[in-house]
């Protein structure tokens, strides 16, 4: 009798796991596995958007370079000593504009493979940091070129009576239209560069 009581007293009741507990553990495991995949998918989506923006910026920079670099107009009338002609290389500001946008176009072409690497390997931060630094440099470069050219285009359209600079766009209409279009395209490229910098900074911050 005593042995029976001692056996009952020393028996340990091990509670069985309920089905709800097993379900919670399974859900937690699934969430732990799904979270990295979700973050990776989000980063890949940001990298794809970055690639698309670079193509758009490349198109804008190339348009600005080609338009300004081929701007040349000669008026149909001339005198014995003068021929009225306007070309982009008559002004150093426009020459700098063409060079700056050509450099921006070349950089964008070279940055596309790095952007593809960021798509394939979205967790790599070195490539994103490099692009962020170079994009910031190109923001300043393209903005300076576009702003300086915009000042010259404004003078071509309106002149400046205080300095006796006359507006020439009434005579050189095609010249002014092409230079104005090139400046607009360059500002678009600069705006896309700014957006790329913000996008890269946000992506690195979330990493």
Swiss-Prot record:
Residues 1-45, 117-128, 203-207 are cytoplasmic. It holds the Pfam family CASP_dom. It is found in: Cell membrane. InterPro entries: CASP/CASPL, CASP_dom, CASPL. It is a multi-pass membrane protein. GO terms for cellular component: plasma membrane. The chain crosses the membrane at residues 46-66, 96-116, 129-149, 182-202. Signal peptide: none annotated. Homodimer and heterodimers. Belongs to the Casparian strip membrane proteins (CASP) family. NCBIfam families: A_tha_TIGR01569. This is Casparian strip membrane protein 3. It comes from Erythranthe guttata (Yellow monkey flower).
């Amino acid at each position: 009798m005593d042995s029976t009581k001692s056996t009952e007293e020393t028996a340990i009741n091990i509670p069985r796991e309920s089905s709800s507990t097993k379900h919670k553990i399974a859900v937690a495991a699934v969430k732990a596995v799904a979270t990295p995949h979700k973050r990776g998918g989000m980063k890949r989506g940001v990298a794809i958007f970055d690639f698309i923006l670079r193509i758009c910026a490349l198109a804008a920079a190339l348009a600005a370079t080609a338009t300004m670099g081929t701007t040349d107009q000669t008026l149909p009338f001339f005198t014995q000593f003068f021929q009225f002609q306007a070309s982009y290389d008559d002004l150093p500001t426009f020459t700098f504009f063409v060079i700056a946008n050509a450099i921006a176009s070349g950089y964008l072409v070279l940055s596309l493979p790095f952007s593809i690497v960021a798509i394939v390997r979205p967790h790599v931060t070195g490539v994103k940091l490099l692009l962020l630094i170079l994009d910031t440099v190109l923001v300043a470069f393209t903005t300076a070129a576009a702003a300086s050219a915009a000042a010259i285009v404004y003078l071509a359209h309106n002149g400046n009576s205080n300095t006796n600079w006359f507006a020439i766009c009434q005579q050189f209409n095609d010249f002014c239209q092409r230079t104005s279009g090139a400046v607009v395209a360059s500002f678009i490229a600069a705006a896309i560069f700014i957006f790329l910098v913000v996008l890269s900074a946000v992506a690195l911050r979330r990493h």
